[in-house]
């Protein structure tokens, strides 16, 4: 077993994906699983079959808060956070992260892999010809950290519930050490598949949650890092476009589209008013 790296997995209704992943690396690395969906079946299976895995329940206060909580149980020099819907993270690729960390003499803030199934518009990546390439941002789906440096930076900002927490971390981290994409670590990210959705109602509620938090977090990120005045000027056209779409879909009777933009309006307006990211799945 490697005693330099701990693998951190955040599970939210992701039992099968989590089990499939840990079966590939169970006896190779220390593993911490943080579950914020109160998955008792996953807990029972871990306790029965994987005695050396640390399993913890946590109140669902968001992705960043869960990772910060997990980091308090990390007692290795490095740790890797990995979404259950990532394919390609195995012993070989984890050791590549470790090799790069040592090659850089630990002078990095975070390391990330190359995503093979994403387009350049939605996910900016580095020149694949450069193996260790500086990046402004690393995707939160898979990030490799030096534990001490992560702690010194204060971890993730827990004001973010969903989206932009890794962007905020990388922006802060970049002022101290660089973030790097490791292009010979190639993975696939099946975005949105980590949560097992039981029915259409759950699917719709999850989509509402994502719409609300994306716009809330985007405004909060800009306000925090670039100031209130800049953020207001930047987002006022966005707000007006949302209002116009709400008006248009009200007149045309498109209830589904109207609801979508009402959710975006509420998320952005709440963030502009300085309200917390308190949107949750309806019971």
Show the residue positions of the predicted features.
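Conserved donor NDP-sugar-binding/catalytic core segment of glycosyltransferases
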Residues: 86-123
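A conserved acidic beta->alpha catalytic loop
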Residues: 35-43
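Glycine-rich, basic loop-to-helix element that forms the pyrophosphate-binding segment
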Residues: 58-74
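A recurrent flexible, glycine/aromatic-enriched loop bordering the glycosyltransferase active site
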Residues: 128-148, 161, 167, 203-206
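Non-catalytic, C-terminal membrane-associated alpha-helical segments of glycosyltransferases
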Residues: 209, 213-216, 228-283
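Short, well-formed alpha-helical segments that are part of the catalytic scaffolds
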Residues: 9-27
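A short, conserved alpha-helix in the catalytic core of glycosyltransferases
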Residues: 142-145, 149-154, 159-186, 191
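Short aromatic/hydrophobic "clamp" motif used to bind/position activated sugar donors
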Residues: 79
């Amino acid at each position: 077993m490697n005693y330099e790296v701990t693998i951190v997995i955040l599970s939210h209704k992701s039992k099968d994906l989590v089990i499939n992943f840990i079966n590939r690396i169970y006896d190779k690395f220390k593993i911490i699983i943080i579950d914020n969906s109160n998955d008792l079946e996953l807990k029972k299976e871990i306790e029965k079959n994987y005695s050396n895995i640390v399993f913890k329940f946590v109140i669902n206060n968001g992705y960043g808060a869960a990772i910060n909580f997990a980091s308090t149980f990390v007692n290795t020099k490095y740790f890797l956070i990995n979404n259950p819907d990532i394919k390609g993270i195995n012993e070989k690729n984890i050791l590549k992260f470790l090799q790069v960390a040592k090659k850089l003499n630990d002078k990095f803030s975070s390391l990330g892999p190359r995503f093979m199934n994403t387009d350049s518009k939605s996910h900016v990546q580095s020149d694949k010809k450069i193996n260790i390439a500086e990046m402004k941002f690393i995707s939160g789906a898979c990030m490799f950290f030096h534990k001490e440096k992560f702690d010194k930076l204060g971890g993730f900002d827990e004001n973010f519930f969903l989206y932009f927490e890794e962007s905020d971390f990388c922006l802060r981290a970049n002022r101290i050490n660089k973030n790097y994409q490791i292009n010979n670590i190639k993975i696939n990210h099946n975005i949105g598949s980590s949560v097992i959705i039981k029915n259409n109602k759950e699917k719709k509620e999850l989509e509402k949650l994502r719409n609300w938090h994306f716009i809330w977090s985007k405004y909060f990120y800009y306000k925090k890092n670039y100031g209130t005045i800049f953020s207001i000027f930047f987002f006022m056209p966005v707000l007006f476009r949302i209002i116009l779409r709400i008006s248009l879909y009200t007149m045309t009777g498109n209830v589904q589209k109207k609801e979508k933009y009402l959710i975006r309006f509420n998320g952005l307006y709440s963030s502009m008013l300085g309200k917390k990211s308190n949107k949750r799945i309806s019971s």
